């Protein structure tokens, strides 16, 4: 390029929902597991999943979990401001109105769905080794067995309309509650545990 030619200034724009992925600390993971063991409420009638065991956390458990969850919501707020390239007029306030654990087994799945409220998340507590191997052997282009896929838009060509991910233990996604997502079934005889 000759010295007298100017560089073209280019800017790309973020488009669609703000979706973030991060790793939770071990103490947060531990309290989610410990409190899930106390869950007695069947949550299946409130959820879209084709999953036999979906249990709700009690209000007492949710109150224990909030101090662990709050810093991650703060991270989301900062990332959202960066994503929007503007500061909040007023810092968002959140209420943990529901919390449940999904104990997904062989052939079970979560069809495309969204969540109630304004903001939501999913945290992965257990991804068994045989499921990891099944996913590694998968040859398709979707999220594969036991994976999660977030969808936005009409699927127009030359447009990114989904994000696929095979989770690891401790992964956390935070996203607008209206963002559609789904979970693929798998054939391995094991239990994959997530919390939302």
Regions found by a protein language model. Give the residues of each.
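Catalytic core of non-heme Fe(II) oxygenases with the double-stranded beta-helix
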Residues: 97-174, 184, 191
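Glycine-rich nucleotide phosphate-binding loop and flanking beta-alpha elements
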Residues: 181
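A domain-level signal for the structural core that forms small-molecule/cofactor-binding pockets
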Residues: 194
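Non-heme Fe(II)/2-oxoglutarate
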Residues: 2-100, 104-110
